[in-house]
Amino acid sequence: QSGSREVLARVGVALKFALCDGVMYTLDANAALKERTLSGEESELMTGVSDFTLDATGKALLCVTQDGVVSFGIQTGQSEMLYTGAADQAAMCGQALLVRAGGSIVRVMNGQMATIRRDGATCLLVYGQKVIELTGRGVMTCDVNGENATTIANGSYEAASIANGVLYLGGADGYTQSVSL
């Protein structure tokens, strides 16, 4: 594609970033979650964060810490512990909080916790009402209850990203496969 590029921010080492309403959220190598506005103002929101996911619908950042999963309201600045325990990743799927912990996927909804998948998940993504997990055997989708599981790609992948209804899969050599969702 042709077009011009513009440097929006220089953040040093960013392990992960997300954009919402003109604000960039970054997780740096020191486990600090920061926000940077388009005007260049930067502030530290939380420390001790190992991963985060933007919940654009709920206007919150789901932050994985050593204690569990914290929801940080990006408009209110309020924090709320949503899940206590070991966690590697977190994402919202409708009203359910999904947590990847030790290869399993746990659903938290209405105060009730249930393990919905035990596939050795290495990555958790959500697209619409689909739960997507990378495992050593392939890429699986299921519903929020862990039912209707389907393998959509065979093989082992290290990374996944979703854009415009397409799941991109890859590893050390970059993104090598795509699957329409």
Regions found by a protein language model. Give the residues of each.
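Residue position within the beta-strands of beta-propeller blades
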Residues: 25-26, 62-64, 98-100, 131-133, ...
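Repeated scaffold domains used in trafficking and secretory/extracellular systems
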Residues: 12-21, 48-58, 84-95, 119-128, ...
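Blade-level signature of beta-propeller repeat domains, shared across WD40, Kelch, NHL, RCC1
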Residues: 156-181
